[in-house]
Amino acid sequence: MLSCISIFYWDQEYNVLDYEEKVVDGFYDVYGLSNDPAMQGKMPSLADLEANPGGSSFEVVIVNRTIDPALEELVQIAQCISLDCPVTEIGIFVQRLAELVTSHMGGPVKDANIILARWTERSTQLRTSLHTSVLPLGSLDIGLSRHRALLFKVSIMACQYLKPCGPYII
């Protein structure tokens, strides 16, 4: 079954999610497949993507805390950060979440080419060890901007019931 939010994300010209859109378990981001003429306009199912070996030219990052203990641990840390920050200090909360994501995803990016090279190497290792191009978000210890943004969104959404943020609920 295709995740509705995954389909919405796939259909967007720039693969953008708004702040109101929740990323829930089952969401997956397909990268590098939209250039395939056979796939134009059609989002492949997760089962089809998982059937492809790790040597495929595309990448899929899945959000699923039930099968991704590293992601579940990161979400729990994010929730602890949320509970530890005063409601009036939302900036501190956001900064700490950003630091959590940065730390988990390979540190600050000083040179995009270096992080891309590190990501390419790590991605190849993960695909080989997992025998698939579908990578659990929590398993990514090096991340490009799309991976970091997704982890930040998942982390902040996990804290939404814990902390009000002005007119928004984080």
Task: Indicate where each model-derived feature is located.
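Acidic/polar, low-complexity linker and loop regions
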Residues: 114-123, 151
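Hydrophobic/aromatic-rich core segments of domains that either
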Residues: 143-170
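N-terminal accessory/pre-domain segments preceding catalytic cores
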Residues: 1-117, 128-140
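A short linear-motif detector with a strong N-terminal bias
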Residues: 80-81, 122-123, 161-163
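Charge-rich, low-complexity amphipathic helices
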Residues: 119, 123-128, 156
